[in-house]
C-alpha cells in the first residue's frame, strides 16, 4: 500500500447501519448493521450498499463490524456468531473491492468502552 495515499484527504463510506435500515433491513435488537451479516437475506443488500457508497465517491469502505463485538452479540443472544460475522463482513467488503479494485477496505472498530477488552 502506498502510504502517500493518506497524506491527502480521502473519502470514506457513510453510515452503514442507518442506510441499511432505510433500504429495508428490519431492525434486530441492538445489532444495527451486524444484522445484515447475521441474516443471509441481507447480504446482497449489504454488498449493494457498499457498491453504492463507492459509486458515490468513497475511496475507502469500512467493514460492518462496528457492532460485532462479543459483549454486544451476547446482549443479543448471538455471541456464538462472533467469528462468522467478522469473517462475513470481510468477505462482503472484498466482493465490493473485486468490482472496484482501487477501493481500500478498513476494519470498523467500536468505541473502546466494553468492546475490545472482552475479546
Model region roles, listed by residue range:
Residues 9, 15-48, 55:
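N-terminal binding-site loop/beta-alpha segment at the start of enzyme catalytic domains
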Residues 14, 53, 93:
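Conserved, mostly hydrophobic/aromatic
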Residues 117-119:
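Conserved small/polar residues in nucleotide/adenosyl-binding loops
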Residues 30-41, 54, 60-85:
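Glycine-rich, proline-tolerant flexible connector loops at the mouths of alpha/beta enzymes
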Residues 77-100:
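Alpha-helix-loop-beta-strand connector modules within alpha/beta enzyme cores
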Residues 10-13, 61-63, 105-107:
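Hydrophobic faces of well-ordered beta-strands that scaffold small-molecule active sites
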Residues 16-17, 66, 108-114:
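Active-site beta-loop-alpha junctions enriched in small/polar residues
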Residues 51, 55-56, 100:
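Alpha/beta enzyme core
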